[in-house]
Every structure is written in structure tokens, then in C-alpha cells.
Amino acid sequence: MSVPAFIDISEEDQAAELRAYLKSKGAEISEENSEGGLHIDLAQIIEACDVCLKEDDKDVESVMNSVVSLLLILEPDKQEALIESLCEKLVKFREGERPSLRLQLLSNLFHGMDKNTPVRYTVYCSLIKVAASCGAIQYIPTELDQVRKWISDWNLTTEKKHTLLRLLYEALVDCKKSDAASKVMVELLGSYTEDNASQARVDAHRCIVRALKDPNAFLFDHLLTLKPVKFLEGELIHDLLTIFVSAKLASYVKFYQNNKDFIDSLGLLHEQNMAKMRLLTFMGMAVENKEISFDTMQQELQIGADDVEAFVIDAVRTKMVYCKIDQTQRKVVVSHSTHRTFGKQQWQQLYDTLNAWKQNLNKVKNSLLSLSDT
């Protein structure tokens, strides 16, 4: 990628121009280049570039892009420390101020580097931090498939991989990207092994709470398969998750009565939990019964007769259940409901359905062939 330069001259003259510019803005830096070479010049320029970032004039972006362009022509072994220093400056400088400029500079640096250079990890983490600080996560690449590829390209250690995914998760949460955040957290927890799963207790705990709190999340069985979550078996948080995976509303009510302080400590709201568990209980009922009486719904969902219709309307809006109300016979007629868990039985049902479709299509095909022969 081509990165704009401050001025089209030799690297040494460019460094001298940068020194002179920074000096004119009040930086404590010599106007003479160092005898140690370009990487020493850049180290001193980066150290003094705070005065440049404080400027509001139109030259700032050109000046900083000149620093970036000089960084990119250095030998890889001389780049890392300087890039880390510049990234630290851009992340910490008056957090929240001039976010567009800081994002642009980091983006230029990131995309200008060789795709397999490990220090891109540092730049990407800095991009995430700046984007999160100003609610601009949508302006940087965060697609999970791409992030997986970068993790592989950069040959990250397990610790750095976990740091990156955790940082990305927190940024997505802060920027209200709950669906993307959940996928990243599942990726993070899925990267642990039997040997280090115990180290992920905090992440697993946070993942469960975040999922239960998410108003648009209703399916949780995939979390139970994650090794760090399995490590929590026997703890209250795991018991609570299990209730949301497959139990009914009555089980949650009993759990809450016995563990009210625990629920409150998680930051979960009881009424929101009740609303979600009513829907989950209804989903389970709808899978097993194509017709459900109002009386049964009132009993199982712990709602009044006047609340049944409003509840059904809200349930249909989630698209987890498709049904209609029969007021005359005081019942709900179900056309489809999403399974709360997807195990062997559900796979068999899916296989049977697809196989039936295949057989029906073959019959149609044979009928059409017989017609064409006549």
C-alpha cells in the first residue's frame, strides 16, 4: 500500500524536515539528523511528535503520514520497537480526541506493512483500542474469519491470541455490537484446551452473563460444550446457564428464590430474566405441542388471562415461535418453534425431513419424465 509522505525527498532529508517542523512547534529535538541512522532519527521524532498531534492545522496528517512512511521502509528488526512506541502515543494521546486522525494513521500503518509481519498484531490492537474509545469499531475490520487468518499469519502465541480476542470482544460490547461480540467470546473460549481451561474462568463467567443479559439471545446450549464453561460445573453460574438452556420458568423462579443475592451480583435483572424464561418455556411447549390452551399457558408461564394475547404477540416478534391465537377455543395453534437445544434427536428429525423432501422431489422428477415421454 502507498502511504502519503510529508515531502518527496530522500529519507535523510525527510527526517531533517520533520525535525525542523517539530522544533518549530516547540518540541525539544535537534534539527540535525543523528549519526546513528534513520531508525535513531525516527525514535527521536516519535518521542517528540506529541506537539504535532496537538496542532489543528492541515499539515498534521501529512507530517504523521511521513513518519509512517519512513517506518515502513526500515528493516523489520528495527521496526518493532518504533512501531510499538508510535502506537502507544496514538492510543494514549488525549483519549477520545482526534479519533479520525489517529484511526487513519494506524490504518495506514497497518495496511502498509507486510501481511505476515508479527508486529501488525500491535497495530491492530491499537486500532481496536482507539476505535472503541470513540465508538467507531465499525470503521475497522473485525470480521471473525479475517481475524482468525491474521492470528494464523502472525503466528501469535496463545497469550497474544487470547489478548487480541478479549480486546476485540470488549470493544464490540462497548460499541453495542452484541451479536459480533458473542461470536468473538465463543471463539475465545473455544481456543482453550483441557490444560488451560481453568485459566478462563473470568472469561467464561463473563460470557455466560453477557449471553443471559442480551435481549436478543435465546439459544445457549452451544455454551455448555465450551471447555472453560464445563470447568464451571457445580457452580451457581453453571446451574443458572443450565436452567436457561433447557429448564422451565418454575425452575428459574425456585433458583431465584434461593439465590437472589447471586442474581443481583451478576447485574442481571430479575424481571428481564422472567420475561426471557417465559419465552424459552413457551418455545419448549410449542415444540412438543401444536396446540396449547390458554389455561396451560397461564399456569406454565405464570401470567394472567389478560396477558396471554400480548405475550403471544411478543413471542412471535422474536421469530423464535410462529403461531396464531384461536380466541374462540382459547388456545394457541403452533406452526413452528425453534428448538432450545439441538442434539441427536434434532439431527435425526432434520435428516428425516430432508430425506422426505428428496423422495418427494424424485417422485416429481419421475412424473415429469413420464409426461415428457408421452
Curated annotation (Swiss-Prot):
PROSITE patterns the record matches: PCI (PS50250)
Entries under InterPro entries matching the protein: ARM-type_fold, COPS7/eIF3m, eIF3m, eIF3m_C_helix, PCI_dom, WH_DNA-bd_sf
Residue ranges that the Swiss-Prot or TrEMBL entry lists as coiled coil: none
GO cellular component assignments: eukaryotic 43S preinitiation complex; eukaryotic 48S preinitiation complex; eukaryotic translation initiation factor 3 complex, eIF3m
Domain PCI, chain residue ranges per copy: 180-339
A Pfam family reported for this protein in Swiss-Prot or TrEMBL: PCI
Protein localization: Cytoplasm
Intrachain S-S bonds: none
SUPFAM superfamilies assigned: ARM repeat (SSF48371), Winged helix' DNA-binding domain (SSF46785)
Gene Ontology biological-process entries: formation of cytoplasmic translation initiation complex
Protein name, UniProt field: Eukaryotic translation initiation factor 3 subunit M
Organism: Pongo abelii
